[in-house]
Amino acid sequence: MKVYLDGKFVESDDAKVSVFDHGLLYGDGVFEGIRLYSGNVFRLEEHLERLEYSAKAIMLQLPLTRKELSDATCETCRQNGLTDAYIRLVVTRGVGDLGLAPWLCPKPAVFIIASKISLYPKEYYDNGLAIVTVPTRR
């Protein structure tokens, strides 16, 4: 599987993120979960708009334009020969010192993963499944 990582397509085994990336250390970043149906990325423009809004909310400067993110997302799917998939587009604050200061992270990181989606087994569609609801607010 090919992964988009900071401007390059690399094999998933070679896709490395630093342990000093603030996305890993502090959850400092934004992401979108997107679907690919019959070779078409579902509502990509709306997803990218929401990604920009989320980044702005945490004062994270996206390192790519909306068109560049769109092209990279579509190319990730193409490189993997996918027509139906789940796409995860992630932008992290990037590598920095320990500590919460975002200005110590000079370069945001971008990675995009697209993979064949594994949905529920057929028996769940035929028979349903048990669920639980909880009052936790997100």
Features from the language model and the residues they span:
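Conserved alpha/beta cores of soluble small-molecule-handling proteins
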Residues: 1-138
